[in-house]
Amino acid sequence: MALNGWHIGERAIRQKVNFSGDLSLDGMYTWISEELDPGLAQFHGECHFLPITTMDSQGRPWGSILAPKGGRPGSNFIQYIGESRLRVNAQVWDGEPILRTGKDNMLVAGIGIHFPTRRRNKIAGSVSRYERARDDGHVVSLDMVVNETIGNCPKYINLRHLSPHSNTQPRVATEKLHLMDDESLPDELVNFILASDTVFLGTTYVAPHKEAALFPSHLGMNQRGGLRGFIRVSRKDGRTLALPDFSGNRILTSLGNIEATHLASFTFVDFKTGAILYLTGEAKNLVGEDAKRIMPMHNKMPLTTLFVTGYTFVLDALPVRQTVGTDTAPSPYSPPLRFLAEEDSGHFTSTKPDQTVLLTRIDLHSSSIATFWFQSSTPLTIRPGQAAILSFVSLLGQSKYAHMAPSNPKSLNDDRVRTWTVSASSTHEFALTMRQIPSGVVTGALFNLGHALARSRPEFLSDTSGLQIQLGLIGFSGSFCLPSPIKGSEVKLLWFAGGIGFTPFLSMLRALKEDDSGCRWDIYMALSTRDPDVLLPLLTEAVDIIPRAKVKFVLDLYTTAKVMVLKESTDVRIHSTRVDLKYIQNIDLTRKIYLCGPKPFEQTVLEGLAKCGVGADKVTTEGFAY
């Protein structure tokens, strides 16, 4: 079936994302071939399983996982039988949707993925013959007539090595094919989704009568990948999923189908246990401000939501598993996790859409650590410990589209938005203390500016307002904040900071100067750093401005670097080792514990605390997964 252009849903979504009218994009539907090449048919037979989309009697799409018997791919699984047709002989299990939806002459779509190499190919068409074995109801055979095929983008496939696993005992753990309005997904399934890095996305296009001849009805099956947890679940209703779209090949057939029929299926696989979660529901695409209300930090691509109306969860089903002793290699193109607005525990505050801040000062502490000060013309509300979200589009411009970028894969989803913890703030001003990231686009630009001024116009460092560098202020985020004090009480805190992870604590210390609760703050801090001569002056400066009657502050400094002479007023104990179990065992762990630093540092501290009986749920953490 040669395509005649974009159908009504594809035209709608392309209009929403401003692809319409671009001559370089308008003809991309011609990339979709109407006939399956025999070589591609062989590729499908070499895949370990075939995700397909079918429809139930209500017209809802369901994703199915068709696998070879015993998990061994080859010609006995999928074979080419000529004239753009595939014969599939598959092992299935109780709960597999095709056992309910399978029939002759049904529409079908599939995607073959070779996970060790990230190759993939999409197919769609119809089923001319469907049979379920009489002697074994868990074997199905179908002949697919393929009239749409495209070798699609491999960018977000997480590489993994798979092996046959024939010793399976599939069991339907829970199933609800039709959810009532007040029902939600069980917590077990929500956690399963949040632990996944891959989803198989099924879609359906039901042609309006006036377009049926030109754009016939069809199904779609696609794959979406990202970091673990890239698909989020609303805890408000427990059944709405949010799938962010990333920079891709810009064909948008899956989103176009959703735009037309507002239905989709999500199918998740646990490659280590063989568990499979099948979801179907009502879907919609959100763009621009509508998307940002749900997921504030998502880039300019669409956000797709799925309101689940039915599900099946099967354990130990897939006769293929991730090869023992191998790790998943995440796609280098995957952007950082983006969370729902509701997940920020009510601590995300957005600003006006066009609010800007002015760069007013630069403090260079070393060649790679500096503080940048910004001023706002409108009042700011920032809780000590929160992070500022800035857009650097005005300074750097939008990143140009490229389909692939092997030398810098992260650049493809770079929306020029960055987040840093605020290190100082007042009603109209805030500061960001940061470390320059090697090859970092944004920190590179900021530090290049600072170093250039230091060389040629050092007097400008103390007042950069004349440069008129205005940045977009998106908002402030985070719940890593000081606890609310009870008037007249004593607040005991234990802070663990790794490197530049000291910045939220810097903000908290500076805020204590203004605390009028009458509380006594008793703070022990363990700081691990390679730059004590940079970080210590900033800490001692923050501590020195607080009246001694308010705060007791003790610092355990862990560093292998030489430490300068300290002020007599500073209570610092210097250790030439790393934060270890011995230190944790000898500190008062009844204090409220905060932890901020790079992942290895965070993991070391959490492991030490766990050995002392303090679980991760008792620790307030902040990482750098912005």
Regions found by a protein language model. Give the residues of each.
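Short conserved beta-strand and strand-loop elements enriched in small hydrophobics
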Residues: 52-54, 107-115, 201, 264-269, ...
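Short, structured patches in soluble enzyme cores that scaffold and shape functional sites
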Residues: 90-92, 112-115, 125-129, 145-148, ...
